[in-house]
Amino acid sequence: MNKKKSKRYKKLLDLVKNKNTESLEDAINKVKQNCTTKFDESIDISLSLNLKQKKEEITLRTVVKLPNGNGKKVKVAVLCEDTKINEAKESGADLYGSEILINDITSGKINFDKLVSTPSMMSKMGKLGKILGPKGLMPNPKLGTVTADIKKAVKDLKEGQVEIKNDKDGNLATSIGKKSFTDAKIIENFNAVIKTIHKEKPSGIKGDFILSSFITSTMGVSYKIKLKA
């Protein structure tokens, strides 16, 4: 941490006088007040779930459609048959192809954020698993990225569909907007994430599924949010 950042961060820490929970509205207001950098900082949340991982235990991995997106541009590639190239092009995909795209990925040319594949092309994805898997780019039916409906998949990804997944300690983090977003848009996105997570609660989990929730900005400090019952 450089001196300039360290001095700024210490000043921000001085503003956090206690560890009391905040209402979502108050927490957003304080996070925004602390956004003193010149760029449009991301507004991020981190959640602690009642889902610590052990071998062969279920992992929460799903997608949530943020009503207002998160302010980040997503570059989408579509792997499809030659007969569907025009459909992929018209869908708004940034990259599209069949064998040529496979060859590009094999050679390490991965200049996209999300990859959509038609079902029939998945049989050719085997050799790409070792390349795409570690990067979290492997198409997955559960996440809506293996589908015959190319137009819908690309539209969803472009309009704010994001993947959420917990780590081995039960923590989950995602971006829900930018400083420039109105409070109402951030709140709407936050509620969409919370609603989706509650729907994914495993039947064997007793008690609260979300143990704690924090909100912060790219260069700011975090505030604990009091979740509504």
Give the label of every model feature segment.
Residues 22-25, 29-84:
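Translation machinery proteins
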Residues 39-43, 200-212:
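Flexible, glycine/charged-enriched surface loops at secondary-structure junctions
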Residues 68-106:
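Glycine-rich active-site/cofactor-binding loop and its immediate structural neighborhood
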Residues 70-72, 82, 167-170, 206-209, ...:
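Short flexible coil/turn linkers enriched for glycine and charged/polar residues
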Residues 94-197:
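Long, charge-patterned amphipathic alpha-helical coiled-coil/hairpin "stalk" segments used as oligomerization
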